[in-house]
């Protein structure tokens, strides 16, 4: 590639580079139009000619053109890297300094590599004044060449004496190119007098280490705590042995073996007389890894052996080989311990804890601990959730009390009988209900000798006695009933019932009669299917719902939960790390919980309105231990929202069929006015409807359009609709979809039963509705005082929260997308947020095109504040420890590349984790605690039970009303602001106080909480879209979900996005960029790209509102 001319007045540069497999080519002297390269040819394996000199000035700017570029390519993919990139061109405003680097620094550019990103320094304008003024008037080539060599020497001198801020990140340099931005590959410097000096290759971001010192001065007291972490004792001088075991079929088609088959073969192997003594000294992970406490005899293990399993006609080929010894002394020498040693210990502890238990993920449930739920097909398994960790105090096992709803083990036919579906023929509604109940269920079959599990895809359209198929051997059409009779000697006793579809592929159907299918022990029951309805049989006492019964079993107050955990750990028979395996490996568990010292952070100062004049604020600090406050007026103050929104036109569509008390809406309106909102007293539209209209998309759309039309006839714009409902309904999803994406109307839904609450509870309910309404119409309920925002309050700061909502567990279809949501604050009080939602690939955790999303959010911030933020605190939710690298080196890198303009903002990255099982308990009754025995809000732990090297802490920011409080586990992955431990913990805690819907701190920092709500709103949009197309065939639906492919990647796919989380939430900007499929995903996808439907764009009127509240 020939040398490029300078690209724009600010970041022009001369010198060119060759792309991999490109090469210098014969450079041209053409004008570098808008930064395009000069003419010339590209050699197929590096150019044969050096790049020419771009002597023409770039059109449109006082920038001199390319200079010497390209270079003589000598190897494939290396052409064009000899000269160029280190050269500088002078821009009209600002010259960008580019560090030099060598070709040898980037071995990945050998053949067909991708351009490598170079390091960057922050630009320093004052150093460029002389260069700028001295070069801008020289346009002839020989003057430009002399200037370049002169300033290159000056640059080298300055660079040698320049000191770097150690907190400055290294990352890719982005240079604007017209409307778009492209990356600058590295280039080799011109020969220097000091050949040994060169830049290091770019390094990846790593999670930051814990800074020296700790928190303390800002806390209001200490508290003694117990943590459900139990110390693990292991033989520190011993060595375990890691073996690789491979098992495959010796005859028949080669297929992936199930875990049950692998475990059976492994057990059979150690029944061999020479290995029998070691059968209790082996831990197996169910795949390829085997761990032993002693080395296996060499004369007993051969590289490959064949044998048959008892009661099976199949032959298996097994190979076992030593991978490496694992000295446990390494756990003392390295913190955290080496990954392979920790993985081995984890497998050993799991194996030592699983005897006689049903193991599901990290859950261990003794079969003796099940509790049947009356009048249902569900049982509750009581057990533990366990995870092995390395902490500052050493190796520990985190053990938590757990209850798992499971199907009652037995025949699927018994399940059908309890549903009273044994009559023939099944009605359409019965067939649909049975299909929904069984779809996704894992079953075993009784007509064949196998323990393999099959997933139910659905039911057949016809009963068993009407199903026929073509025999692949004879080519004749055979009845299913006759096939089972002849092949398996089985009579089908219920031919009127449909069969279960257990097919693993569309090409090979597998229909099995219901009576030959069984539900195994420990088959998880989907929580989403739990019944909320209570028994309403006349003459019988009202029975609690299944969900209510399970909640009573699973939710324990702190003291009861602590006792349950201690009982489970101390159980000699069913406790963790028990039995022969634990004895042979000499691993044991301390029966006492670990004791730590926590600190209680002081609550922040909040700002409210005074109700006297706009802009005047009232500051107050919460003094109650539970950190709750209210809006009740006192003689000496008047508490109103910090900024009241304006609601000029609102209406009511009553889906409760007039069941709502007539004065309830009026009470809401008066409460809104009392809290400082500007709201008209009378609605501009009222209509009484019913739940049938809400459930029918066509009728619902007509009702909503009529409401909007009625407002327009009065020359008003409908802003909000109150929508009372009799009960929760799926029509809620289509209501939100239509109003927020088609019509641009905010909605406030609530149950009509709220009007029947007692006066005190009703007033609280109405207040919460008013707070939600104010947030939706652009108001601000409460704000943080600047003194409560450490370090960044004096700057233009932005808080960003991001989360991804995935399809629920057990979902069979891979066409269902994951929903990503990103929110960002736009005010100094950290209370107003804007949102962007995107749909992306199924179960893809990395947020696609995060940089483009953040660019939009910064644009919204700039629109409000007339300037861009110079400090960003990025909160990320829902990622595991193993995905920290993805957050830092993919999401963060994408963000930096897109938002970097001049001096990019400083960034701090914080991950919030709620899906863990660490619990904090007051040591005794003398410790400060809530009324129900939970730790107080603001309790933070950052010693002993935290990561030995990472910068993390546990923060319990909320008052646990029910059960045991779960602290949030925060990790600081990157900190360019230099927060002290106290400052960072205080910032996170204080952000929990500005959640718009309540007057108490929430369990999660507000930016993350909002992202969670917004992502969940996107999930509702998607489900609402699917409800609007019930008649679409599978083929047409699949075709509709296929986005257009990107021209540069066969597997690239279009994507819009959407939110993720837990309550009503929503977002905007879903029409933006379309992400490109990850390479690995594209290669493995049989469908081509990504199978998901784009979400509709958010209506422009709601684009920057907090509609998700």
UniProtKB/Swiss-Prot annotation:
Which keywords are on file for this protein?
RNA-mediated gene silencing
| Pfam families from the UniProt entry | ArgoL1, ArgoN, PAZ, Piwi
Under the heading InterPro entries, the entry gives: ArgoL1 (IPR014811), Argonaute_N (IPR032474), PAZ_dom (IPR003100), PAZ_dom_sf (IPR036085), Piwi (IPR003165), Piwi_ago-like (IPR045246), RNaseH-like_sf (IPR012337), RNaseH_sf (IPR036397)
Which parts of the sequence belong to the PAZ domain? 411-521
Ranges annotated as biased composition (Basic residues): 135-161
Location of region: Disordered? 1-83, 125-220, 527-548
GO MF, one term, reads: RNA endonuclease activity
Name a single GO biological process: regulatory ncRNA-mediated gene silencing
* GO cellular component terms, semicolon-separated: cytoplasm; nucleus
Which PROSITE patterns does the entry mention? PAZ, PIWI
Gene3D superfamilies tied to this protein? 3.40.50.2300, paz domain (2.170.260.10), Ribonuclease H-like superfamily/Ribonuclease H (3.30.420.10)
Record keyword Nucleotidyltransferase present: no
Gly residues: bias regions: 14-30, 37-54, 62-83
Q: Tell me where in this chain the Piwi domain is found.
A: 720-1023
Q: Which stretches does UniProt call biased (Basic and acidic residues)?
A: 1-13, 125-134, 527-545
Residue stretches in coiled coil = none
The entry's family comment says: Belongs to the argonaute family. Ago subfamily.
Sum up the protein's function in the record's words: Probably involved in the RNA silencing pathway. May bind to short RNAs such as microRNAs (miRNAs) or short interfering RNAs (siRNAs), and represses the translation of mRNAs which are complementary to them.
Q: What's this protein's name?
A: Protein argonaute 3
The organism named in the record is Oryza sativa subsp. japonica
